[in-house]
Amino acid sequence: MYAENYKRFEELIDKLREFEGAIIVEGPRDEVALRNLGVRAEIIRLSRLPLSEIALIASSYGEVMILTDFDRKGEELARKLLRYLEGYPCRVDSETRKELKRIAKKDIKGIEDLYGLYLKVISVSDPHLEGIR
């Protein structure tokens, strides 16, 4: 990741921490990474139910963030989820995923790698903060 993206990456992590809706991820390691980052929002894993049921459950939170991985499968899942969620009265955030992908794709394959990248970024951007956050 380029140094000029460190601040924006940290802002996106803060956005995840402050999010109060439901976050949709692919699997348990993605959930663990988000919890390690301090995310307190409801996390719904795709590995448990059909997409139509996931969309219904997630929409009940009023606000939904799609955080699938950055590979072809993750892209396809994100597109399908967006289509399912269009039929529900909820706000869908797919932009956070797109921005994370844009600034971090060279460093990580997916959501499960966010925590490791975060630790790396804070140690490089401000070594005095390592271990504090």
UniProtKB/Swiss-Prot annotation:
A GO term for molecular function: metal ion binding
Phylogenetic classification of the source organism: Archaea, Methanobacteriati, Methanobacteriota, Thermococci, Thermococcales
Domain Toprim as annotated: residue spans: 20-100
NCBIfam families in UniProt: PRK04017.1-1
Binding site for Mg(2+) 2: 69, 71
Protein name as annotated: UPF0292 protein TON_0187
Keyword Transmembrane helix: no
Required cofactor names: Mg(2+)
